[in-house]
Amino acid sequence: MAELPQSRINERNITSEMRESFLDYAMSVIVARALPDVRDGLKPVHRRILYGLNEQGMTPDKSYKKSARIVGDVMGKYHPHGDLSIYEAMVRMAQDFSYRYPLVDGQGNFGSMDGDGAAAMRYTEARMTKITLELLRDINKDTIDFIDNYDGNEREPSVLPARFPNLLANGASGIAVGMATNIPPHNLTELINGVLSLSKNPDISIAELMEDIEGPDFPTAGLILGKSGIRRAYETGRGSIQMRSRAVIEERGGGRQRIVVTEIPFQVNKARMIEKIAELVRDKKIDGITDLRDETSLRTGVRVVIDVRKDANASVILNNLYKQTPLQTSFGVNMIALVNGRPKLINLKEALVHYLEHQKTVVRRRTQYNLRKAKDRAHILEGLRIALDHIDEIISTIRESETDKVAMESLQQRFKLSEKQAQAILDMRLRRLTGLERDKIEAEYNELLNYISELEAILADEEVLLQLVRDELTEIRDRFGDDRRTEIQLGGFEDLEDEDLIPEEQIVITLSHNNYIKRLPVSTYRAQNRGGRGVQGMNTLEEDFVSQLVTLSTHDHVLFFTNKGRVYKLKGYEVPELSRQSKGIPVVNAIELENDEIISTMIAVKDLESEDNFLVFATKRGVVKRSALSNFSRINRNGKIAISFREDDELIAVRLTSGQEDILIGTSHASLIRFPESTLRPLGRTATGVKGITLREGDEVVGLDVAHANSVDEVLVVTENGYGKRTPVNDYRLSNRGGKGIKTATITERNGNVVCITTVTGEEDLMIVTNAGVIIRLDVADISQNGRAAQGVRLIRLGDDQFVSTVAKVKEDADEENEDEQSTVSEDGTEQQREAVVNDETPGNAIHTEVIDSEVNDEDGRIEVRQDFMDRVEEDIQQSSDDDEE
């Protein structure tokens, strides 16, 4: 092996060499391969292909030429890379599902939406489309700069004139070193309207531009969900746009349905999309699909048919397909383009500004070129006019000259002509000496003078030049503009909501004393007779018990109000569905409670944006507040303040109202006050509230509810020892807010303090929950109706150390099976009810029963009348002062 001479060996630090070489490579990829120019929207390979087509004369009015011929010419003259990369770039420009406005008119197999590749270049043919001519128009009028090709033997354009904004019209995508670009296509009509608006108002905002440019317009049509992603991308250059297929649910007879997809998202491979759907069905991740077929054809266009099982919900299946397949996907916008040869992230306005400046430059340079040509021609015509005026002398001078050179010099000296004028006279044919030709020269000269004046006016006034740009853009819009294909659906779609995948059904959400939460289908609990055994609703932890329960739809909102006056929000389906015996999950795993924060009220709401509804709050110290429901529509997982109060107070309950109801506030010592809701003026979300009831010593608020002014409803009172009764609402007279209230029950050791005061119609079911986790569901109509001073009847028999922890109303379900024992009739014909209780200390959970006469002997009516009289006297002598603490 021969030794290399030392002079040819250059020692370099490998770190420096790697750094410099990689930087050179990276810049080459960025500037000369992967990123489009902001002015014409083309990468070098695309620009070279189009210029090659133009140089070969492959215009739309000419016949197609073999693709191999085009690729070979481009590769040999301008693009010294692989022929396959050139052909693939040309194929993409010919695909109407890849380019919104195809730049190559291909003949043959140029691929499909299923990912099929194009035929070999020896089989396909191509030429330019009509709109491509507008990218190249005036390229030979010094409108752009030309540069040397790779070997210096040819010249190629550094950028195309681009009479329409191709960067945004057809979009671009590319991966460079350390950066990538992904620009969506747009509608040409909207783009040009946006450029026109920008030209008239340079200070236009992006929001105003979006009045002209609604958003991307994909060649495959489809849907765009919401405008927030579009706005973010237009303002910052980066964003995510949600795309969705266009699908309809059709009836196919026999009560069966099918889903028909007619448009798919941009850049989605249809065949792979169908394979993904089939895979999900095969893996049983999507249930209810019986058949899947592709009926796409040239006649019908895209048509993917999905047959749905008869008992399946087609809407839920479609939403699952959106969630789990490319039927819905996102387009990540990253608007990076070359600006003055450097990669830059640009927003919508910057892209249009750079394009408009490019057009002004193109029109200015073209005008300057035309002006030079016009002046050159006028200069020649001036010489011809001189020659025609002195034709005999001209002929004599030429005849006397020995050579052409002498003749030219003689003409220049004698008639003060320039070299070009003298040469034009020598080149003039004899037939132009006729009178007719003389008139033509005069007419052409006068027209040129007018034309020169017009061109000079354009160059002298920037506004005139700008108007010319507008006129040319308007012409392009009128010739090539079309209707938008992609529909933008408004409504704040950022992503497919989980509730779209979940059937709407009634559920029960329970919350335990130790803050464990879960949901169950409402059908889990069976309607039972008063005094029934109950259903074990959960297995509680030691010293834990169910404290709250609400019924709602899976799609409804649940507002959680805490003792500290904060509010949190969840959807019904966001609470985990667990078994009936499960204790649930810690509520802090669902909402972010603060330390020592306890949920005091759960309330179900369907429409948080309602302007007709209000929330009424009551605290333990008797403070009450009314606030519009819409104030609570923007609640996040961290929660927000719902009401402010003193440190020694806490929130007891919240109720949803219509704004025209009566407020009922009840206390643990069985006092109840009723006053019109209208006496509470609406306050802000964080306001404190005003006094609702004056409390006696040791008393506190335990219940809050509402009733209509002329309501036939009843007040249901339940005590901690399992007693309850119904009393007509009208037995409680209206009084002033802030009073002490009137008696609603007689409190004894037998029935205990009041734990629940609420209104009922008699058509509900009642769920009573004990601290042992026992839940009983009974018909409210089975509860006796008694006077205000009555103690009530036994609703549930409790074991030792058991007490009623919470009570909730649920809708009565006539179809639910009643599995409890029916009412029995005693020997004397008196109707009786059988009561039962689960005693956890009894082996085998034995059920103890006893028969209780349903007729309850109330206290003497005179006691109630006397108590009512004393309440009225006490209320009349009380000062009715309102403490408006806000």
From Swiss-Prot:
GO CC terms of this entry: chromosome; cytoplasm; DNA topoisomerase type II (double strand cut, ATP-hydrolyzing) complex
MF term (GO), any: DNA negative supercoiling activity
Major site of localization recorded for this protein: cytoplasm
Residues covered by region (Disordered): 810-860
Active-site residues, record numbering mapped to chain: 123 (o-(5'-phospho-dna)-tyrosine intermediate)
Enzyme class, spelled out: isomerase
Disulfide cysteine pairs (residue numbers): none
Location relative to the cell: Cytoplasm
Keywords: Antibiotic resistance, ATP-binding, Cytoplasm, DNA-binding, Isomerase, Nucleotide-binding, Topoisomerase
Swiss-Prot/TrEMBL catalytic activity: ATP-dependent breakage, passage and rejoining of double-stranded DNA
Motif (GyrA-box): 528-534
Domain of life: Bacteria
Enzyme Commission code: 5.6.2.2
Any single Pfam family the record assigns to this protein: DNA_gyraseA_C
Biased composition (Acidic residues): 813-822
Other remarks in the entry: Few gyrases are as efficient as E.coli at forming negative supercoils. Not all organisms have 2 type II topoisomerases; in organisms with a single type II topoisomerase this enzyme also has to decatenate newly replicated chromosomes.
Family: Belongs to the type II topoisomerase GyrA/ParC subunit family.
HAMAP family: GyrA (MF_01897)
Quaternary data: Heterotetramer, composed of two GyrA and two GyrB chains. In the heterotetramer, GyrA contains the active site tyrosine that forms a transient covalent intermediate with DNA, while GyrB binds cofactors and catalyzes ATP hydrolysis.
Its job: A type II topoisomerase that negatively supercoils closed circular double-stranded (ds) DNA in an ATP-dependent manner to modulate DNA topology and maintain chromosomes in an underwound state. Negative supercoiling favors strand separation, and DNA replication, transcription, recombination and repair, all of which involve strand separation. Also able to catalyze the interconversion of other topological isomers of dsDNA rings, including catenanes and knotted rings. Type II topoisomerases break and join 2 DNA strands simultaneously in an ATP-dependent manner.
Protein name as it appears in the record: DNA gyrase subunit A
Species assigned in the record: Staphylococcus aureus (strain MRSA252)
